From Swiss-Prot:
E.C. number: 6.1.1.11
Family annotation (InterPro entries): aa-tRNA-synt_IIb (IPR002314), aa-tRNA-synth_II (IPR006195), aa-tRNA-synth_II/BPL/LPL (IPR045864), Ser-tRNA-ligase_type_1 (IPR002317), Ser-tRNA-synth_1_N (IPR015866), SerRS_1_N_sf (IPR042103), SerRS_core (IPR033729), tRNA-bd_arm (IPR010978)
Protein name (record): Serine--tRNA ligase
Upper lineage: Bacteria, Bacillati, Bacillota, Bacilli, Bacillales
Gene3D superfamilies: Bira Bifunctional Protein, Domain 2, Serine-tRNA synthetase, tRNA binding domain
Binding residues for ATP: R262, S263, E264, E349, I350, S351, S352
Subcellular location: Cytoplasm
Domains as described in the record: Consists of two distinct domains, a catalytic core and a N-terminal extension that is involved in tRNA binding.
Alphabetical UniProt keywords: Aminoacyl-tRNA synthetase, ATP-binding, Cytoplasm, Ligase, Nucleotide-binding, Protein biosynthesis
Enzyme class: ligase
Gene: serS
Function: Catalyzes the attachment of serine to tRNA(Ser). Is also able to aminoacylate tRNA(Sec) with serine, to form the misacylated tRNA L-seryl-tRNA(Sec), which will be further converted into selenocysteinyl-tRNA(Sec).
Length: 424
């Protein structure tokens, strides 16, 4: 959520920056109307309440003096009715303004490339050499099916499309990656491990920006109004909702493994085979709470931490600086890390690393004090995948495949695989 005071005094500037996102700003123009009416109603209501108090005191004086107070009593009733009407209108205006504020995306950072679509994203850097195969490489779903380590067909029978059973060495590879990533981020990168709930309430989804805009993309438990988490970012960020931290606690860095659940409502027909786009998948998420002046340095560190996973796995990748039209709703600046997938002949996203500045913290009311009695300020929040496990499995299977269909296990994972060097 944007700062309403900043928006009020910089309306045209904010509007111009949001236009770079390519968002529909039809409702945005209502801000000035609603904000002005809200402030008018507040003034009118306070004036009438003040008058009501004065009249009430006058009535008390008249009654003590045994004088007729009927006219003033009638006047107070009229004032009370006006206050009630104004309060009702104020409540409606505030609800409309709140809905509008929750629907306004974050302001892009000045360093985000201006553009409309993914074609306008900018390559920040690349790492590793794309392997040239002496044979026609297979897609990971064929490799895994032939090896008996992934079963999409039975998962489709048990649940439906976009689900999978991991079996044997496939299940162990998934588990190895989870342990490897968590060990790396906690032991070397300084994150504290968290194992979060997989269901959250509506306030949590609103705090991180999934609601109200993206409710159709979420799986909801209607009987409880809980949501299955689309990412560990949601529960982990909301750990500190409605809290005031002190500056000595910052930065806070969490690494959280979780399963993630997404309806993929807008992805019909895309990536229908394999692990790239599943309704349920595992991920290690990195979440940070930092002082505002440190957040862009922390974004670079966060991105480097996610990159380090791919470097140790020796998987070629590139880092994209996302343009204003491809930032997503909540980010002020975002990097996507894309790993090379041979069967696609291109790079595919495996991590998004974002700085939300105070956007989420304002929605979730997460603040800190620089001094014991200082005025609370909103923290800046960041998060990034460190990494998506299923897509990492896909990248390993395809990049490490051999002509006979076996898979070389990356050296860094072998201690987690019981010393095995090959999946066959």
């Amino acid at each position: 959520m944007l700062d309403i005071k900043f928006l009020r005094t910089n309306f045209e500037e904010v509007k111009a920056k949001l236009q770079h996102r390519g968002e529909d700003l039809t409702d945005f123009g209502r801000f000035e109307e609603l904000d002005t009416r809200r402030r008018e109603l507040l003034v009118q209501t306070e004036e009438l309440k003040s008058k009501r108090n004065e009249v009430s005191q006058q009535i008390s004086v008249l009654k003590r003096e045994k004088k007729d107070a009927e006219a003033l009593i009638l006047e107070m009733r009229e004032v009370g009715e006006k206050v009630k009407d104004l309060d009702n209108e104020l409540r409606t205006v505030e609800e409309d303004l709140e809905r509008l504020m929750l629907s306004i995306p974050n302001i892009p950072h000045e360093s985000a490339p201006v553009g409309e679509t993914e074609d306008d994203n900018v390559v920040a850097r690349t790492w590793g050499e794309v392997k040239e195969f002496a044979f026609e490489p297979k897609p990971h779903w064929d490799l895994a099916t032939d090896l008996g380590i992934l079963d999409f067909e039975r998962a489709g029978k048990v649940t439906g499309s976009r689900f999978v059973f991991y079996k044997g060495a496939g299940a162990r590879l998934e588990r190895a990656l989870i342990s490897f990533m968590l060990d790396l981020h906690t032991d070397e990168h300084g994150y504290e491990e968290v194992l979060p709930p997989y269901m959250v309430n509506r306030a949590s989804m609103t705090g991180t920006g999934q609601l109200p805009k993206f409710e159709e993309d979420a799986f909801r438990i209607e009987s409880e109004d809980y949501f299955l988490i689309p990412t560990a970012e949601v529960p982990v960020t909301n750990m500190h909702r409605d809290e005031i931290l002190n500056k000595d606690q910052l930065p806070i860095r969490y690494a959280a493994f979780s399963s993630c659940f997404r309806s993929e409502a807008g992805s019909a027909g895309r990536d229908t085979r394999g692990l790239i786009r599943q309704h349920q998948f595992n991920k290690v998420e990195l979440v940070k709470f930092v002082k505002p002046e440190d957040s862009y340095e922390e974004l670079e560190k966060l991105t480097n931490d996610a990159e380090r996973v791919l470097q140790l796995l020796e998987l070629p990748y590139r880092v994209m600086s996302m343009c204003t039209g491809d930032l997503g709703f909540t980010a002020a600046k975002k990097y996507d890390i894309e790993v090379w997938i041979p069967s696609y002949g291109t790079y595919r996203e495996i991590s998004s690393c974002s700085n939300f500045e105070a956007f989420q913290a304002r929605r979730a009311n997460i603040r800190f004090r620089r001094e014991p009695n200082g005025k609370p300020e909103h923290v800046h929040t960041l998060n990034g995948s460190g990494l998506a496990i299923g897509r990492t499995v896909a990248a390993i299977l395809e990049n490490y495949q051999q002509e006979d269909g076996t898979i070389i296990i990356p050296e860094v994972l072998r201690p987690y695989m019981g010393g095995k060097t090959v999946i066959k």
